[in-house]
Amino acid sequence: MLLHIPGLFDADELARIREALEQADWADGKVTAGYQSAKAKHNLQLPEGHALAKEIGSALIDRLWKTPRFMSAALPHKVFPPLINCYREGGNFGFHIDNALRQPKGSPERVRTDLSSTLFLSDPDSYDGGELVIQDTYGVQQVKLAAGDLVLYPGTSLHKVNPVTRGQRYAAFFWAQSLVREDSQRALLFEMDNAIQQLTADVPDHPSLLQLTGTYHNLLRRWAEV
C-alpha cells in the first residue's frame, strides 16, 4: 500500500529548511547503508544526530502524529529518527530493499522497518530526475511529489531513486515499526477504518457502526504486537 500525505510543511517553512540545508556539512550517504545497499548508494546525508536533522525530524514526526490518515495507515509503534539526504547531479540510489532492523545511534532499542516514508523537501520543478521508484503488487510506481508532501510505503518494497540530472533533491526519510507487522493486514484495517469514518459521517446513528467498530478493534487486538 502506497499512501500520499500532502502539505506537512508550508512554503515558508520549506524555504527556511532548504536555506539551512544549503549551508550544512554533508557526509557520504553510504555510512548508513547496509553492505549490499552501499554498493548502489550515491548520495549525501546529514550525519545521524545532526542538530538540523533532529530539528526537521522532530517537527515531521510531531505533525504525522497529528495526521489521522497517517496514524490509521501506519499504526506506528516505534520510529527510527528521520534522516536527511541530498541528491545532486549524478546522485542516485539503485534498486535495493531496506535493512529489516535499524538501531538508532546511542539507543539500545531496535526498530523493525515495516514501513518506509519519504518527505520531499525540494520543489519538483527545481530538479530533473530523482523520482522514487517503488515496485509493488500493482507494478512499478514512480513518485515525485510536491515539496512538503510525504509518501508512505511498505519497507519490504524493492525501490530506487533515479539519477538527478539537474539541481538538488533534498528529502527526509525514516522507518516505522507498526503495531501490525503484515502489510496486507494493515491495509485491511486501514480500509475498514476509512469505511467506519465515512459511515459515521453519513449515518451516524446506524446500529451496525457499533458492530463494525468492535470488529475493527477485535482484528487489531488479534494482529497487534506491543
UniProtKB/Swiss-Prot annotation:
It comes from Pseudomonas putida (strain GB-1). Fe cation binds at residues 96, 98, 159. Pfam families: 2OG-FeII_Oxy_3, PKHD_C. Its cofactor is Fe(2+); L-ascorbate. GO terms for molecular function: 2-oxoglutarate-dependent dioxygenase activity; iron ion binding; L-ascorbic acid binding. PANTHER family: PKHD-TYPE HYDROXYLASE YBIX. This is PKHD-type hydroxylase PputGB1_0905. GO terms for biological process: DNA damage response; intracellular iron ion homeostasis. PROSITE patterns: FE2OG_OXY. Its EC number is 1.14.11.-. Keywords: Dioxygenase, Iron, Metal-binding, Oxidoreductase, Vitamin C.
